[in-house]
């Protein structure tokens, strides 16, 4: 990709990334902030749509402010992106922001041989924070290049406490001993159990969101990644 093509992707993505959004602070955020103080590459993995990109935004607001470069590899404009293009990204990001201290790469597994480029960024003293939907795949590939120099963080969908924060439901220590409040908490727990903790689904309530997550996991993370030829039989197996 040319430098101009990269600029047309990097600039708007970073503008969106740095826009403040009213989101639920994830309970893992304090732990992640401590890990960010280490020299290790951080790998945030977890279910698709569990909120990994939002967690990146939260840690950026907490620690880095305007010292970051962000790139999401699920952008259709990056379909032709290859590992060789990381050099252009490196040069472009310094051209746009010479105060860069950290790079955030979202869904990095979409680029083959990405781990080679990450070694260079890390070697040049930049903090590197990655997300991906396949924990074992990311750890295995990065481990071949940065043995002992990366840390894995798994992000799960909302916990019950995070769900209550999303619903703006305040809970006091003794609420379980007050019948009316205890009944309300039981109802909230039942709703959380039945709906799950996917932030996007909770926000919009559309069943299509959950169905699309299922399809993405099935196709992108399993069938394509592992070269499964008999898709029909695999789908039947997945429905069991």
Regions found by a protein language model. Name each.
Residues 69-101:
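Short glycine-rich substrate-engagement loop in P-loop NTPases that contacts/grips substrate
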Residues 136-152, 166-168:
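Short regulatory helix/loop adjacent to the ATP-binding pocket of P-loop NTPases
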Residues 19-36:
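Pre-Walker A adenine-sensing motif
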Residues 44:
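Hydrophobic anchor at the beta1->P-loop junction of P-loop NTPases
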């Amino acid at each position: 990709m040319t430098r101009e093509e990269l600029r047309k992707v990097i600039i708007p993505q970073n503008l969106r990334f740095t826009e403040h959004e009213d989101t639920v602070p994830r309970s893992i955020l304090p732990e992640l902030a401590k890990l960010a103080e280490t020299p290790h590459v951080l790998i945030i993995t977890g279910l698709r749509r569990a909120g990994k990109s939002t967690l990146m935004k939260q840690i950026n607001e907490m620690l880095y402010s305007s010292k970051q470069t962000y790139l999401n590899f699920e952008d259709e404009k990056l379909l032709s992106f290859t590992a060789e293009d990381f050099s252009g990204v490196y040069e472009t990001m310094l051209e746009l922001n010479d105060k860069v201290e950290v790079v955030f790469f979202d869904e990095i597994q979409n680029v083959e041989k990405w781990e080679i480029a990450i070694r260079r960024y890390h070697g040049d003293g930049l903090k590197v924070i990655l997300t991906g939907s396949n924990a074992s795949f990311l750890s295995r590939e990065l481990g071949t290049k940065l043995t002992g120099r990366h840390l894995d963080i798994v992000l799960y969908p909302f916990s019950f406490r995070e769900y209550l924060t999303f619903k703006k439901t305040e809970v006091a220590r003794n609420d379980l001993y007050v019948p009316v409040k205890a009944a309300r908490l039981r109802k909230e727990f039942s709703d959380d159990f039945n709906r799950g903790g996917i932030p996007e689904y909770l926000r919009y309530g559309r069943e299509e969101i959950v169905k699309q997550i299922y399809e993405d996991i099935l196709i992108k993370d399993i069938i394509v990644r592992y070269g499964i030829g008999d898709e029909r039989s695999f789908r039947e197996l997945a429905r069991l």
